[in-house]
Every structure is written in structure tokens, then in C-alpha cells.
Amino acid sequence: MPNTKPVATAEYDAVIATVQNYIEGLRGGSNPTIAKAFNKDATMYGFAPDGILLGGPISNLYRYVDEFGSAPEIKTRVDVLAITPSTAVVRVDMEGDGAGVDYTDFHTLLKFEGKWEIIAKVFHAYE
């Protein structure tokens, strides 16, 4: 059995760069920048600070950014939890979005035609 590394370090960097588009879009309140990270058919689900389950198409995120604006002081930590040649799971811990809310996100990414895209975002928002 060959002892080969299936995923190059550069792929981790590419995954993080994709997620960084999401973060920088939040920081600047820029939906076009956020959209660089997400597949057009991406979905998102999660719990709001009041415990209500929210979900649906990624356009809900764009509406949220339109409503609450930029997050110039946002703090984040990004961890690639798992990666294969075509899939990845990333955790984003963030403090201080445009509404002042703290979150933990889990993003599932697929590599489409050589480009990483987030296809699903699940989140937990804290009070």
C-alpha cells in the first residue's frame, strides 16, 4: 500500500481563502465578496440567539448583511476540521458580526471544477 499524501497543503490554504471571502464580506458588509465563497445553491440552517431555528437558501445571509451592515471589528478563528481531495469541513468561530452577535459556523465545501465553494452553512448564534 503506497504511503502517499492525498491532500496537498495548498488545498488547505485554498479552503481557508474561500472561507476568508465570507469573513471579509461580513467585515465590509459586502454581499458580492461573501458570494465569492458560496455556491449559488448553498443553504444555511442554525439557531438564532433566541433559540429559534432559521434556515433556507444562502440569500437569507445576504438579506441579513443588507439589514445589519458591516462588522469592522469582527474577530474570527478558522479551523479546517477535515479535508479530502474534493470535500472539506471548516469551523469558523466569530465574535461581533454586524448585529453584534457571536457565532460558531460549520461550513461544508465541495471542490467544483478546481474551485472550492461552500455548499452548506450551519450555525449557532449566542446571546
Specify the residue positions occupied by each region the protein language model found.
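Residue-level recognition of short loop/turn positions
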Residues: 41, 50, 113-115
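Terminal "cap-and-tail" regions of soluble proteins that handle hydrophobic small molecules
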Residues: 2, 56, 115
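Surface-exposed, charged secondary-structure patches
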Residues: 11-14, 43-50, 54-102
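Short beta-strand edge/turn micro-motifs at domain boundaries
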Residues: 102-127
